[in-house]
């Protein structure tokens, strides 16, 4: 599995990654190790992306197929995570700034972007539109810092503990997001 993964990553890094799949498809070489790739539309491979991680994340496969492929080839967790994140959140971010604050906050939380924005930034890098990507960099990334700095008023914070505190903080963050999104 490790050797097949190494060759797979080399193919993803190649100038023409589709050739790897074409050759294996022509000799029925995909069936054992890469069966999910047999029906994959090769014209949809992300040729304009040089990084194997980005190309893997953009493979035109279903979530189940990506999961099975990653497990079989013992792919590094970052590759599977990038693909799952893309499938889960790219569409939401593509609607920027006409997104629902609650949905956006849920995505930010699940990506743990208030603590480390790398996963969110990778999704943004996977966008086809440089204009939208730059807009998100200008608007969403600073908004994360603002969200992180939001706090409950002291009198309200003093009366809440545990899950109730977290729910109240989420509520003010979602409200803040909705207000900011409406102003964009």
Label for each model-derived stretch:
Residues 1-133:
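Conserved, hydrophobic alpha-helical core segments of structured domains
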Residues 113-184:
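Charged substrate- and nucleic-acid-binding regions of tRNA-handling and nucleotidyl-transfer enzymes
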């Amino acid at each position: 599995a490790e050797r097949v993964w190494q060759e797979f990553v080399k193919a993803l890094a190649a100038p023409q990654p589709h050739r790897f799949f074409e050759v294996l498809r022509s000799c029925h070489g995909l069936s054992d190790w890469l069966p999910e790739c047999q029906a994959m539309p090769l014209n949809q491979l992300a040729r304009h992306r040089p990084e194997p991680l980005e190309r893997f994340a953009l493979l035109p496969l279903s979530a189940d197929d990506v999961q099975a492929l990653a497990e079989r080839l013992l792919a590094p967790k970052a590759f599977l995570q990038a693909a799952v994140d893309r499938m889960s959140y790219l569409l939401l971010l593509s609607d920027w700034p006409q997104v629902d604050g609650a949905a956006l906050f849920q995505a930010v939380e699940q990506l743990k972007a208030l603590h480390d924005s790398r996963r969110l930034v990778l999704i943004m890098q996977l966008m086809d539109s440089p204009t939208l990507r730059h807009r998100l960099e200008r608007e969403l990334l600073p908004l994360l810092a603002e969200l992180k700095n939001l706090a409950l008023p002291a009198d309200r914070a003093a009366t809440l503990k545990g899950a109730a505190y977290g729910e109240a903080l989420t509520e003010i963050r979602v409200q803040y997001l909705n207000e900011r999104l409406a102003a964009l």
